[in-house]
Amino acid sequence: MWYVMQVRTGTEENIRCLCQRLISSNVLERCFIPYYQQKKRFQGEWHIQERILFPGYVFLIAQNLECLVNGLKKVIGLTKLIGIGDQIVPLVQEEVELLMRIGTDKQLVEMSSGIIENDRVRILSGPLMGMEGNIRRIDRHKRIAYLEIEMFGRTVEMKVGLEIIRKE
């Protein structure tokens, strides 16, 4: 089961390392932070940078929730596990499949490329293929697409790298 832990923004990597160090691998199968690639121009050249896909969240894969909660008590800086009310619930299968489709096993959403035809976006390559309907806006200058997706039981905005090759 995939669980999501809310932490203070900026402390995600520290919390991930703490979880891996303090919680037994028998309990915590995997702890990760999904990233996305973004192109940024500095020193006259384009560079690909990696940014956190969901700032303030760390993802955990574990089968036994009770043991996971006991292990997380040792982790300092944890805000809460995401759930409904007081109940901790795992991500639903559609959310897990979406994360695996766009981020693969590396949990890294690579740059997509596309074109704009008649004021409509068409993705030519990359993980955003087939997700054109989720794109709410595009910042062509920063090479970022803003998507609206269902995650954590609510609609969230997600930023991913998108290079528009041409506009027709």
Where are these regions (language model features)?
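Acidic-enriched and Gly/Ser
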Residues: M1-R120, E148-E168
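Terminal RNA-binding accessory module
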Residues: M131, K142, R154-V156
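Residues embedded in well-ordered secondary-structure elements
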Residues: Q49, R122-L124, R136
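Short beta-alpha junctions and helix-cap segments that line functional grooves
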Residues: E45, M131-I135, Y146
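Short linear motifs in intrinsically disordered
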Residues: E110-S113, N134-D139
